[in-house]
Amino acid sequence: MSSLETPPSPRRRARWKRVDILPANIRLAEAELAFAGRIGRENLLKKALLSVSGEYDYVLIDCPPSLGLLTVNALNAANGLLIPVQVEYYALAGLALIRQTAELVRDLNPDLAILGLVLTFFDARKTLNKDVAAALADEWGDTLFSTRIRDNVSLAEAPSNGQDVFSYKRSCYGAKDYAAFAAEFLERTEGCYGTRG
């Protein structure tokens, strides 16, 4: 993919009403190199999303765990930042870097807000998980979503079987947790971005 003016693959209708997916592919790796020499490179995704902005209530952009040009494009195009946090101590250091990056990107996108943090791979039986969750609650307060995505083998098995967790095993903890999180997320963001309902 040499630019974002034309998406790398067609949007696919998901099994849910009003949900489309534009999956990444191997060509996305070329994008970072292609962006490097472009004038206005940090605005490419923002411009591409403008062409479909009236079609969606939400656009979720999954970023790589790096702070390169793809992530800067995503943060510049976004209204809000949702941060999934694996409940381990190294994640605390990573959060400081994410917060710093969000502050830097606000020079390009002053509307970028941290919508919240959601804890993932949570196991209430592990003291470390409880300690990290408590430290995050102390530091981030209400920014931390109350729903926790519990560690669940079905979350790992579903994609390896080519399915989302709801199709794979709707009754598992992972599916229930993500459904609860989606409801909490929608409640928190309702009316914030001019959604069509």
Where are these regions (language model features)?
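P-loop NTP-binding core
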Residues: 1-197
